[in-house]
Structures are given as structure tokens and as C-alpha cells.
Amino acid sequence: MPTLIVATGNPGKLAEMQTYLEPLGCQLTLKPTEIEVEETGSTFYENACLKASQVAKAVNQWAIADDSGLAVDALDGAPGLYSARYGNTDRERIAKLLQALEGVSQRQAQFICVVSIAAPDGSIQLSTKGICSGEITHSPRGDQGFGYDPIFWLPEHKKTFAEMTKVEKQKVSHRGKAFNKLIHQWPGLKFDSF
């Protein structure tokens, strides 16, 4: 089984991916720092594919990438692709989103994640998508997780992501769903063909 190059410079994302892919026993390593990929896609799918493909070609190895974000219905899908750039810090992003939703009663939202795997020639061999639907709270709750977790409420669990344990969140999150699909489709990958 090949080592997968993770198309990120973020060690936290590498650790998270290793947790999800642990059942497969594959090795993951961060992309070289000198490889920069500009996210110019207009969808999470395009950005995940772009990152995986460019990194795979640059290092001539298999690569994996994900792209994700929060889409709020009342804001026409914003912050969407710009979720990570909606402010400088998690606190700023949350404050900006809550301000944009002030006085809005319909607060449905979805976290979306797309995971893509590219062969050494850059061709995309597998992409999966996970969606987790919930609502945006009126104020932060919980101290686990990161990003928008304190304001993303899952009615069926009566908790925000930030109130869940890591294991609880992995079972229901957008990223968990995308990686679960990937694990089930993994046997179809033809690593020896490249």
C-alpha cells in the first residue's frame, strides 16, 4: 500500500485524517512545504480535486485532500468556500456569522466535506462527499472542537459539535461521513496500476 501525501501543511489535519483512515493501515505524510496550491475551484469538490491532483503530480505519489466548509441557508450558502477566511480567528468568524444571522429565525445550515484521492499522474481516482445538517445557534455552546463547532447545533443529538466528544463528532460529522464512504470504496482503488 502506498504512502498518501496529504495536500496540506497542517499537522492537525494530518492527525485527523490518520484517525479516520486508521482501519486501512495506510501511511500518511504532509506535503512538502514548498508546494502551494491555490484554491481556485468554485465548489468543495473542485478544490479537493485540485489540491489532490496538483500535489500528486508535484511529488509523483498518491495524494489525498479534502475541502470543507459551512453553508448557511439564510445566507445563500455563505460562508461556503470562504468558511476559513470569513474572519481572522475562529472567534471572529463566529461573531461575524452570528451578526449576519441576527433577527433570522430560519437558521438551517450544512457542513460539507469532499475528500479526493489522486494517482501520481494527477488523475482523480476517488472522491467522496459528506454532509451534516444542523442549525446555527444564537450563541456559542461547548468548548470542544474548532471553527464553527460551538454554534453548529444538531437537533437530533441536542448538542453542538463543541459539546460532543471527539468520538461522537467523528460518527456524525461531514468529514466523518466523507471518510466513511472513502473507506468503503477504498478496495476499488488500483494502486498497482500507477
From Swiss-Prot:
SUPFAM superfamilies: ITPase-like. Homodimer. Its EC number is 3.6.1.66. The active site is at 67 (proton acceptor). It comes from the Bacteria. Mg(2+) binds at residues 38, 67. Its cofactor is Mg(2+). It is an enzyme of class 3 (hydrolase). Gene3D superfamilies: 3.90.950.10. This is dITP/XTP pyrophosphatase. Keywords: Hydrolase, Magnesium, Metal-binding, Nucleotide metabolism, Nucleotide-binding. The keyword Nucleus does not apply. GO terms for biological process: nucleoside triphosphate catabolic process; nucleotide metabolic process; purine nucleoside triphosphate catabolic process. Transmembrane segments: none annotated. Pyrophosphatase that catalyzes the hydrolysis of nucleoside triphosphates to their monophosphate derivatives, with a high preference for the non-canonical purine nucleotides XTP (xanthosine triphosphate), dITP (deoxyinosine triphosphate) and ITP. Seems to function as a house-cleaning enzyme that removes non-canonical purine nucleotides from the nucleotide pool, thus preventing their incorporation into DNA/RNA and avoiding chromosomal lesions. Binds 1 Mg(2+) ion per subunit. InterPro entries: dITP/XTP_pyrophosphatase, ITPase-like_fam, RdgB/HAM1. Belongs to the HAM1 NTPase family.
